[in-house]
Amino acid sequence: MNFAFTEEQEELRKTVRAFLDAKSPETAVREQMETVNGFDPAVWAQMGSQMGLMGIHIPEEFGGMGFTYIELGVVLEEMGRSLLCAPFFSTVVLAANTLLQSGDDAAKKKYLPGIASGETTATLASVEPSGKWDEARITMKAKGSGSSFTLSGTKMFVLDGHTASMIIVSALTSKGVSLFAVDGNAKGLTRTALSTMDQTRKQAKLEFSDVAATLIGTEGKGWDVLSRVNDLVVVALAAEQVGGAQKVLDMAVEYAKVRVQFGRPIGSFQAIKHKCADMLLEVESAKSAAYYGMWCASEMNEELPSVASLSKAYCSEAYFHAAAENIQIHGGIGFTWEHPAHLYFKRAKSSELLFGDPTYHRELLAQRIGI
């Protein structure tokens, strides 16, 4: 295994960064986070038609580019750096991975080409009002047989759930947790955008009342699919987190060079030096964890479950600590609404809690390695 990125992967990073610098500057982030939908449809269309980003790891047979999870991780790292406001994570990471892991060729052929082109926005709705990612907490009922069902219940904290054109929903049948595809505008579905701390990542409450749904995969095998998907999801999130962590480290170091106090740059003071050095150590360690997770995901090897939990736990804390220290190094200006430091701090906190916080993943890691 080679930890160095290939020339092609570095070129991908360069291209994506240039695109995001142009399309997702701080002004665009602030503009989109104030809107209900939370993203610019024109930029989304360019991401699909010009860049092909939505199909980055989707197999070519389903209209994608057929790259590996490493390339997806490179893209997500750059998106984390720029705080991109778009339904990319929900569509490409949550929904596409669920379809790919479902084993349902018909569903893949039906939905993946639209996702790869950017025509379809999608998401995964699994968490219920308890807020826990847990099989035992899934109580939504599915009634029906064959491939046609109706769903009733509530899903919470659904990423981009208020705008997704297709929603994958977990629900209980007589055979156990199963997965279903629901049209975003289906009759009986009520979608409510939630007010969240992190305005750059939209979430929604979805209420189902006898909503028509189509079975995805094998009835009763939904949690097996979701368990595999969660490992892939947290690895992807770790990649996004290290992008944000590197950005706040860069912000802190740059400010320490130009902010003068007592006749000298504050970066020359030992206390600031130590803060920056500690941030660097954590960020570089987080990158190692995230990159190894990306490689494990691309290989789908037996290490993936353990490495996924390890990377999510470590990268969550590294990003949150770096974002908090960035505010401290900036001093008073770092606490203001006008400065971008708080945007990264809020993203760091929301990402820390998504799909299991560090405590959850440490416990899961302990179980997975047999402690």
Task: Tell me what each language-model feature is.
Residues 86-106:
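N-terminal glycine-rich flavin-associated loop
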Residues 100-103, 143, 169-172, 181-184, ...:
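Short beta-strand-to-turn element immediately C-terminal to the catalytic PLP-Schiff-base lysine
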Residues 118-129:
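A short, Trp-centered hydrophobic/proline-enriched beta-strand micro-motif
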Residues 134-152:
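Cytochrome P450 C-terminal beta-domain/meander region
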